[in-house]
Regions:
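C-terminal beta-signal and adjacent terminal beta-strands/loops
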Residues: 845-892, 905-910, 916-1009
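Transmembrane beta-barrel wall of Gram-negative outer-membrane proteins
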Residues: 257-364, 384-406, 600
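Gram-negative outer-membrane beta-barrel transporters
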Residues: 604, 726-733, 744-865
């Protein structure tokens, strides 16, 4: 027991730093204003904290462990007038330089108070760090953490996914107050998975590669969000904004209302002298959560064609009609909150508690036009998705002396998600049972059998709609929880050298359960009459047979086969991936050289189940089920990752910097864990395994971490007191990227070396990314502030994502794996943003103009690469409604007319605006504002039909093959309405839209007390 306890303690103190130290550092020099002599022993204090330092023999001082925020720094010295500099911003993990020049009390009698300007050139950072502060965020027209991050140079946001410097999706690690907010099950890459109340953010820090040894868990970028801390006085803000000024599908000011309503409340302040708090809460509702261009149409005379078994000529339940820019049944409810609590136990010991919780609910089956159309008549009882996310962390900071401190962190994160029938909840055995529907009063007259619901409606040659009062035939739930601990030790060895050492350990518990075919499972269990109960000889046989894909298609781990009770051990127990790391880092800070040298150790142990013998796994022949006692777990991966960063502050206005580093990241575990022993049995069985990846058959245990080597070189230059630019060049070598590939025999068994066994995730893809980033910043001059971000880049590789090789796997006779790199799907050669902010301060411009401001945000990109393909020469397996996108949906039928990704979609330009007016009232500030997204209502083309190279024609109606269908009544008009006008076929093939979002106008009011 003692040995285990010691091992646990060592693990906590010596393994990885995924929880990032969030405090900043302040340094500078205190001198005599007249002579320039150092003022030895001058007292430097950070107002509102117990932090401070004394100047050394050269007048230099260093203050460690300052929480990010804006402070007033005070300096005093006997015989000199004190100086206070306010508005000094300290950033997480960075060094802020602030020098002081004190005048003798014989020359100046009164204390000097100065308001600091944010430095345009970061002198002490040795890599690309892009900061967005609460002041920057306040006037932006957009909302959402990921949307704000995507404004920076080096980023690409495409189809809702964020890419940084050419890395694949999911290669970004998110942290909130130092707590990891990323989930390794999914490697969150879409904006809805990472959310923070915008009014609670103190700063957002993007490190687009090149991060130092204390940071890990990502191949492409780190996004660190610091939450606000309560101040020395009570502060309350209330914000409400909405566009809900018109009914669904109707317009207000020429713009369709999305039914957007967002309310935010924040409260912060002190309790006594030692405790401070900050709380934020947000309620968000959207009647139409997916803003999309929808051209209205109305078909009132369509009838059933009888091709699903219904009566020929019978009327459909209602007209097939859509209103402009509105998707019915597409609402979303989202409630979340964050809070921080700081307790100063003494001048040396401080505690910080951070918490966050989010509850999100929306119906499934209506997220885009394709889903909304197919489910047009079944919106009365859609399947629901509820997701709950929470995180909490406690950090203790102990200042041993003014130059040394350590931090101890513990944190917990959790995510739970369910897709369920709103009437029956988790009791999925009732989902497809007619008797249960009758009990609730539903009309079941059209049900075919006791476990078989109504037939689909079908019109104009089998375009189908789901029926009313029908069963929901699937159910799923999953959960991920992590418990982590970390220690970081920092010491300012002398005024020039800082040493850091630390480590962290995270243990996850992951569970998943899904039923893919409930009606078949019910027939198998209870017979087609519902009364013939199947008997099983034992629980093992029941579990094996019920999980069969031919029966219920149940995938599970961490729950039993029924999804009722949790299973905590064994091969069907939860997955317990372990992530550990340790680092040592030395930062040398001189006036003309800053050197940051570090070494990081990472250990990743995914513990994936695999058969001991890949060629001939041990199987229960009677059930074709893998022998669970013969399974083993994959071995852990260990890496040493050097990091070297340095900067040359040539002058106060010019800094050169360069960086080299190695990075690793585990691919998302959802694809790797697959679905427990049932899924593994199908994938590796000598009877059912496939060499072609058919029917989603592949193994995940062959995957290992992906690697990146990055190089960076840049210059920061201040041209005037108010204007500066940064130029950065980067190069990335992308290694061991995941792809579908055949797992080959190693020659130690009965099969010859190189013989394919089955398909799995193999780290055989590779690529390169290179680019030039430029940022121009104009500090406010004569009411105008501006910032321009621009990126010129090229990303090439052998695969845009891990599934790019599915064609090569599915038919090796006509396809081959890429051996040469090409432009990837998300490559955007040119991308940028321009932000202009023009505003009148109080007392400026008279009573009408004072407090008035306008923020204009222009975003642009040159489009992304795609491959032109031939139009289909036959229907193949496509329907008369999907044939126009057949080759896009089924890559086996794709016939390119050019090398891969030789073409490019058109340029995109978008303008968002904010107009606001602040009124200073007696005890509070009142702000009225309007946000206008896509101000010119531009139909930006974000994707194209690969057959025609256009956004409004898939080519099918012009094909001679379409003649026989065009003769059908209403076929041409309906095809035009749903496919060419509203992209139903494109959604079906890709899951994406062709156009960006239409204009949205939101009006709001904000009160600050």
């Amino acid at each position: 027991m003692l040995r285990k306890a010691l091992l646990a303690v060592c693990a906590v103190f010596l393994l990885p730093a995924l929880l990032i130290a969030q405090d900043g550092k302040l340094r500078g020099r205190v001198t005599d204003k007249e002579s320039g002599d150092p003022l030895v022993g001058a007292n430097v204090t950070v107002d509102g904290t117990s932090l401070g330092a004394a100047a050394d023999l050269r007048g230099d001082y260093v203050v460690l462990g300052i929480p990010p925020g804006v402070y007033t720094i005070k300096v005093s010295y006997i015989g000199y007038q004190p100086v206070s500099i306010s508005n000094v911003r300290v950033n997480a993990g960075l060094t802020t330089t602030q020098d002081f020049k004190l005048a003798s009390s014989a020359i100046e009698v009164t204390a000097l108070e100065v308001v600091a300007e944010r430095p345009l050139v970061q002198r002490n950072t040795t890599n690309t760090v892009r900061l967005t502060t609460t002041e920057d965020i306040e006037n932006l027209p957009i909302r959402g953490l990921q949307n704000i991050v995507a404004l920076n140079a080096g980023t690409v946001q495409q189809n809702g996914t964020l890419y940084i410097r050419g890395g694949r999706s999911g290669e970004v690690a998110y942290f909130v107050d130092g707590i990891t907010a990323s989930n390794p099950m999914f490697n969150d890459s879409r904006s809805e998975n990472i959310s923070v109340v915008q009014e609670a953010i103190e700063e957002i820090q993007l490190q687009a590669g090149g991060f130092t040894a204390e940071h890990g868990g990502a191949n492409s970028g780190i996004v660190k969000t610091t939450l606000k801390t309560g101040g020395s006085a009570l502060r309350v803000t209330v914000d409400y904004r909405t566009d809900d000024f018109a009914k669904a599908g109707e317009e207000f000011l020429g713009t369709t209302s999305q039914g957007f309503r967002n309310a935010v409340l924040t409260v912060g302040g002190p309790v006594g002298s030692k405790f401070r708090y900050f709380l934020s809460g947000q309620h968000n509702y959207m009647r139409n959560r997916t803003a999309a261009f929808v051209d209205q149409f109305n078909f009132t005379t369509l009838t059933d064609d009888g091709l699903t078994g219904r009566t020929v000529g019978a009327s459909l339940p209602d007209a097939v009609a859509f209103k402009k820019n509105f998707l019915p049944g597409n609402q979303r409810y989202d409630n979340q909150g964050q809070g921080t609590f700081v307790y100063n136990l003494s001048n040396a010991i401080k505690f910080r508690l951070t918490g966050s919780y989010q509850h999100q609910k929306f119906p499934l089956g209506f997220a885009d036009f394709r889903q909304a159309l197919n489910n047009l008549f079944s919106g009365d009882r859609p399947q629901h998705l509820v997701t709950k996310r929470g995180l909490g962390g406690l950090k203790m900071t102990h200042l041993i002396n003014p130059n040394t401190f350590y931090e101890v962190n513990v944190n917990y994160t959790a995510r739970d998600s369910r897709t369920f029938d709103p009437d029956f909840g988790d009791d999925w055995l009732k989902y497809s049972d007619r008797r249960e529907f009758e009990k609730l009063g539903y009309d079941v007259s059209e049900w075919q059998k006791i476990f078989e619901g109504p037939l689909n409606y079908s019109t104009i040659f089998k375009f189908q709609f789901t029926p009313r009062n029908g069963p929901i035939n699937t159910y799923s739930k999953d959960s991920q929880q992590s418990l982590g601990a970390a220690v970081d030790f920092t010491s300012q060895v002398n005024k020039n050298i800082e040493m850091k050492i630390g480590g962290r350990f995270d243990r996850w518990t992951m569970r998943a359960y899904s039923v893919g075919d409930i009606d078949n499972a019910l027939v198998y269990l209870y017979g087609s009459d519902g009364n013939t109960i199947r008997n099983f000889p034992d629980d093992y046989v029941r579990r094996v047979e019920l999980a069969s894909g031919a029966v219920g298609g149940i995938n599970y781990y961490g729950w039993d086969v029924d999804g009722i009770n949790k299973v905590n051990s064994g091969p069907n127990g939860p997955q317990h991936p372990l992530f550990g790391s340790a680092y040592v880092q030395s930062k040398w800070e001189y006036r003309d050289l800053i050197l940051n040298v570090g070494l990081r150790y990472e250990r990743i142990d995914a513990k994936v189940l695999r058969p001991a013998n890949l060629e001939d796994p041990a199987f229960d022949k009677s059930n074709d089920f893998i022998q669970e006692d013969q399974l083993i777990r994959t071995d852990p991966y260990n890496y040493l990752l050097p990091r070297l960063n340095f900067a040359f502050p040539v002058t106060a206005n010019t800094v050169f910097y360069a960086q080299y580093g190695k990075y690793i990241q585990m691919p998302n575990l959802n694809d790797i864990y697959r679905g427990g022993t049932r899924r593994l049995s199908v994938d590796v069985s000598t009877i059912t395994r496939s060499l072609y990846g058919f029917f989603n058959q592949y193994v995940g245990f062959t995957a290992k971490p992906e690697r990146t080597d990055q190089y960076e070189l840049g210059i920061r230059q201040s041209l005037t007191d108010n204007f500066a630019f940064t130029v950065t060049a980067f190069y990335k070598d992308l290694k061991d990227q995941l792809r579908f590939d055949r797992v080959l025999a190693d020659g130690t068994g009965r099969l010859a070396a190189g013989t394919p066994i089955f398909v799995g995730w193999i780290n055989n893809d590779f690529g390169t990314a290179k680019g030039l980033e430029m940022t121009l910043e104009l500090r406010r001059v004569k009411r105008l502030a501006a910032r321009l971000n621009y990126t010129l880049s090229n990303t090439r590789g052998t695969g845009s994502d891990s599934r790019s090789t599915r064609v090569a796997v599915s038919d090796a006779t006509i396809s081959s794996y890429p051996t040469l790199i090409y432009n990837l799907d998300y490559n955007q050669a040119h991308r940028g943003t321009a932000m202009l902010d023009y505003r009148f301060n109080q007392g400026d411009g008279g009573s009408i103009l004072q407090g008035l401001g306008l923020n204009a945000l222009l975003t642009f990109n040159s489009g992304h690469n795609y491959t032109k393909i031939l139009e289909p020469s036959n229907l193949g397996q496509a329907s008369a409604w999907t044939v126009g996108t057949r080759a896009t949906q089924d890559p086996r039928t794709r016939n390119p007319v050019e090398p891969i990704n030789s073409s490019t979609t058109p340029w995109n330009f978008n303008v968002d605006l904010t107009l606001d007016k602040v009124f200073k009232l007696s005890s509070f500030d009142l702000k009225l504002y309007a946000n206008v997204l896509n101000a010119f209502n531009t139909r930006n083309i974000i994707n194209l039909y690969e057959t025609t190279g256009t956004a409004n024609d898939d080519g099918w109606l012009k094909s001679p093959l379409a003649a026989q269908y065009i003769e059908l009544a209403n076929y041409r008009d309906f095809y035009q309405a749903i496919n060419l006008d509203n992209r139903w076929g494109y959604y079906t093939a890709t899951g994406n839209d062709v156009y960006g979002a239409p204009r949205q106008i939101r009006f709001g009011v904000s009160i600050e007390y």
